């Protein structure tokens, strides 16, 4: 499975991306989410995702 991090500053949009897409059907798992680029960069270093 591919590890995905969702980075989006708008909470409703970020939650919508996470909840409306069938990630399992795409062979993906949500490894984390971030509210801004700085948090996203920290998660990327820590989690080594395949997709951001």
Where are these regions (language model features)?
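Two-component/phosphorelay signaling modules centered on CheY-like receiver
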Residues: 11-32
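Non-catalytic signal-transmission and effector/linker regions of two-component phosphorelay proteins
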Residues: 1-3
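Acidic, metal-coordinating helix/loop segments flanking the phosphotransfer/catalytic sites
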Residues: 18, 33-51
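Short hydrophobic transmembrane-like helices used for membrane targeting/insertion
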Residues: 5, 51-52
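Conserved acidic carboxylate
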Residues: 8
């Amino acid at each position: 499975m591919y590890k995905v991090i969702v980075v989006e500053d708008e909470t409703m949009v970020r939650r919508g991306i996470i909840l409306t897409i069938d990630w399992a059907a795409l062979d993906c798992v949500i490894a984390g989410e971030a509210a801004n680029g700085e948090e996203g960069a920290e998660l990327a270093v820590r989690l080594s995702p395949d997709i951001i």
